[in-house]
Amino acid sequence: MKNNGEQQDLLLPKWLEWAREIQAISQTGLHFAENHYQRERFSRLIEIAADIISVHSDLDQAELVEIFNDQIGYATPRIDVRGAVFQNGKLLLVRERADGGWTMPGGWADVGDVPSTAVEREVLEEAGFEVSAQRVIGVYDANRTGPLEVFHAFKIVFLCDILGGEPRTSNETSQVGFFSRDDIPEFLSGERTR
């Protein structure tokens, strides 16, 4: 099974593509395993996937195995939602505490979330503004160069209207601001802007 041909090859290092695929096959295999032999083999493949990633990154192999073992059921990409919020022609950005970079407010959609509701919640939590998601303006494969993600994800960007609130930071954000196209900060968050 090939992943999206040549474009996929340009975005991810082969070792990460292989490790993700091994992890996903193993996770799904564990879900459907019928005996302890199958469970042992799929568990070993999870360890191999973690080994591959830990050799090529600063991530700990044992922690990766634990993270992978916490994933249950059929493996699918994760959903990350982002809010494109404008005021007087300026885009709302938040500064990440994790890496000090700027990004549109947002985060992982929770199980059971409608994506538009998830982005409304995330903008309120991270920036202090109550918004209404109007429409999807972009869906992006989060596989990019830069800091690598262990799991595959898609980003859904919503155009949002402000209903109320005021700028407020959170435990994940250290600054909130609106920026014109010419004033977008140079240091964009590698964590969530890709």
Task: Tell where the protein language model's regions lie, with residue ranges.
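Unchanged
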Residues: 109-133, 141-194
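Acidic, metal-coordinating catalytic segment for phosphate/diphosphate chemistry
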Residues: 36-82
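Nudix hydrolase/Nudix homology domain
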Residues: 2-44, 48, 101, 171-194
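General structural signal for alpha-helix termini and helix-helix connectors
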Residues: 28-32, 70, 142
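N-terminal strand-loop-strand
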Residues: 65-104, 131, 135
